[in-house]
Amino acid sequence: MSVSSSEGPPWWEESEDNTSLSISWGRGVGTRSVSTCNGKLNLTDMGLTELPPLPEGILELRLDKNHLISLPPLPSSLLVLTCTRNHLISLPPLPEGLRFLLCNSNQLRSLPTLPSSLQVLECDYNLLTTLPELPASLEELMCGKNRITSLPSLPDLIELDCACNQLLSLPPLPASLRSLDCVANHLRWLPALPERLCVLYCKENPIETFPDLPRDLGYLMCDMYGISIELEDTTPEGIQQINTQMRGWTELLEQQSKERCMARCAIYKEQIMMVVWHPTRVAPFIERGIDLEDMM
């Protein structure tokens, strides 16, 4: 259903006691009305293709599972906005007091400036390649299933889900982090893991170097040096054993890498010397009476 002039102009009506707002549209038997109580307006799964101008006073606006491609200016009073599973290609400027933004499963290529009050940002399943600067108040960031190539500096997050992107590295992780999901990226190494981390999912990455795992890590899903590991309800002793094994693997790989490097260097040196000692370059030294042995 479209909230548009073809069905009659929508309008807002405020109750006499100022405790609720109603939106109505359509004509005759097709008229529909939705009320909001205590500043909460739920328009989920109503087939909407557009919205009328929104009045002030709305604190929580839920627009999930519609067919919206854009939103009108948002009321400055808004604290919660959920607009998942629409066709949004952009968002309007966000109110300064907004705390929760859920815009999953749209067609967003960028996000507007995030308000300093934002606590939760969920923007999974979009077309994002970058994120704006993250506010210091942010606690939960869910940005998986996008095309993000790098993350901005992270505030004191509790949960970070950046799975299924195109990340080559992660920024330093905050000490407050409890859960990290970075599955299916292009990560070759992980930064130092916070001591409070409880959940780590990092499968489907070509990780070559692992930091020590936190002692209190409870859930682990990763690919270590070609070995797939999935652990649940781990103990500090088990984590210590894994760390010991990983250090051993790392040392072995470093030694093998050193040997491969020396072998490659020997080949490169031989190829270089073949060019340097080509007859056309050697002849001038012989003519000058220079002993070639002194140059080896």
Regions found by a protein language model. Give the residues of each.
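Consensus "Asn ladder" position of solenoid repeat domains
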Residues: 46, 63-66, 86, 106, ...
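Ankyrin-repeat and related helical/solenoid repeat scaffolds used for protein-protein interactions
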Residues: 168, 173-233
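Low-complexity, intrinsically disordered segments with a bias for serine/threonine
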Residues: 6, 19, 24-28, 80-81, ...
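N-terminal capping/linker segments that flank leucine-rich repeat
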Residues: 1-50, 58-60, 226-296
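Canonical leucine-rich repeat
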Residues: 51-54, 71-74, 91-94, 111-114, ...
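Leucine-rich repeat
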Residues: 90, 110, 123, 127-130, ...
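Conserved hydrophobic beta-strand positions in leucine-rich repeat
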Residues: 21, 41, 61-63, 81-83, ...
